[in-house]
């Protein structure tokens, strides 16, 4: 991933230095277990533990000749360890190192993402309570529908963030597995206890069964979860982008001192970070499709997944980490305009209460179809003539023969329409 979108802590997990360091951790965990079992002389193990290290420049030199990164890595270590290096990598295959180390990286990356996701949920909860009773127009198909509250938008996102936390915890657990089972997963030259003990030392679980690799449904599941979380962030970003439109003006990204919105138009304040998040969510979804393609490999393993994962695993984690960092800042500092929300509620001159009127009529021994026709007829006149819907209803003889003035007034009662907001908040777990 390019530097522009890489935060330091997440970026460090996916550096070459850390990648090789994780490889070394795996090799050392296996050697330690084998030494405990008497399979490596204790003196040799102490020497290995003291001397084992790698040199990235030297790895690159060796790989240029041997065309194999794990062999180059092991050769670099051997040059530092000397004769006792013969005990390193005993009974193992390259993917024992690669896949187990990748699991360690994914676990670390997943925990960083989880922390930011939990913070997002906390911010959403705070803002939901803040705007719980702030009335605004609800829209379907982009058209004014019925009143809602701005707090309910945050409550919806809060609830979804909770589901994503559950998903991510499960996906981290699923991908936190190692395999030290040899060339085709049969433990032909290793004892199964070596795998179990080494994985325990590394803080992960052994895969119950493996081939030459850990099966890629685990990685696909993990990237699926990242893409779904990205979908929530895009949902929030798209909503803010719509609400920031000039003709809507209900909410906007914070615009800092000295910030400029356009090279040509000095007046512009654009939702650029939300737009960036929308674009990044597309990348997350495209990476998921590639991860799904990696599941079906030849027999006990081919290498077609390897080149792909060198890109999609770092990039997806780095992207989502950055997206969460940005959306947290956006939501926490979101500029909200309740006055414009109130003004927008009045744009349709009362048409947003048409369903309440329809239902009131159906309770007066009139068919739903006839009631719908009565309300729609008046509503269309309101649209065409720019009239106030309630005033037209008050003077509509066809409607007045069924409903009293008090009954009509009740249909246009905003407070009554929003009477269940507190109950929704309680059900979500915010109140």
Residue ranges, per PLM feature:
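A helix-coil-helix interface module used to build multimeric assemblies
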Residues: 1-187, 191-197, 206, 259-262, ...
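Amphipathic alpha-helices that form helix-helix packing interfaces
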Residues: 33, 113, 117-120, 124-127, ...
């Amino acid at each position: 991933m390019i530097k522009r979108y890489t935060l330091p802590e997440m970026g460090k997990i996916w550096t070459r230095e850390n990648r090789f360091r994780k490889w070394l951790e795996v090799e050392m965990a296996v050697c330690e277990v084998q030494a405990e079992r008497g399979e490596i002389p204790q003196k040799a193990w102490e020497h290995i533990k003291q001397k084992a290290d790698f040199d990235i420049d030297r790895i690159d030199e060796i790989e240029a000749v041997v065309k194999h990164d794990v062999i180059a890595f092991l050769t670099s270590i051997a040059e530092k360890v000397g004769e006792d290096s013969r005990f390193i990598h005993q009974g193992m295959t390259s993917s024992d190192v690669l896949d187990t180390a990748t699991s360690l990286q994914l676990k670390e990356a997943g925990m960083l993402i989880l922390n930011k996701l939990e913070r997002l949920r906390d911010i959403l909860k705070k803002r939901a309570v803040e705007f719980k009773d702030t009335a605004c127009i609800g829209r379907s198909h982009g058209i004014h529908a019925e009143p809602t509250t701005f707090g309910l938008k945050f409550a919806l996102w809060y609830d979804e963030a909770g589901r994503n936390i559950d998903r991510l915890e499960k996906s981290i657990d699923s991908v936190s597995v190692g395999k030290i089972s040899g060339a085709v997963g049969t433990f032909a030259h290793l004892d199964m206890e070596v795998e179990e003990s080494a994985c325990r030392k590394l803080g992960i679980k052994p895969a119950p069964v493996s081939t030459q690799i850990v099966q890629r449904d685990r990685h696909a599941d993990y990237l699926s979860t990242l893409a779904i979380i990205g979908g929530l962030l895009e949902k929030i970003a798209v909503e803010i982008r719509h609400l920031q439109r000039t003709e809507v003006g209900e909410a906007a990204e914070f615009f800092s001192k000295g910030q400029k919105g356009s090279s040509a138009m000095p007046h512009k304040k654009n939702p650029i970070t939300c737009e960036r998040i929308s674009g990044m969510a597309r990348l997350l979804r495209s990476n998921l499709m590639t991860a799904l393609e990696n599941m079906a490999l030849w027999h006990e393993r081919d290498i077609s997944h390897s080149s792909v994962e060198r890109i999609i695993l770092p990039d997806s984690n780095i992207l989502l980490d950055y997206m969460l960092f940005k959306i947290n800042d956006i939501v926490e500092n979101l500029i909200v305009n309740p006055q414009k929300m109130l003004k927008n509620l009045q744009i349709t001159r009362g048409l947003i209460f048409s369903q309440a009127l329809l239902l009131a009529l159906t309770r007066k021994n009139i068919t739903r179809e006839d009631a719908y026709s009565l309300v729609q007829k008046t509503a269309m006149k309101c649209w065409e003539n720019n009239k106030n819907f309630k005033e037209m209803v008050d003077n509509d003889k066809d409607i007045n023969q069924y409903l009293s003035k008090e009954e009509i007034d009740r249909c246009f009662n905003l407070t009554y329409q929003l009477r269940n907001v507190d109950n929704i908040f309680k059900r979500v777990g915010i109140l």
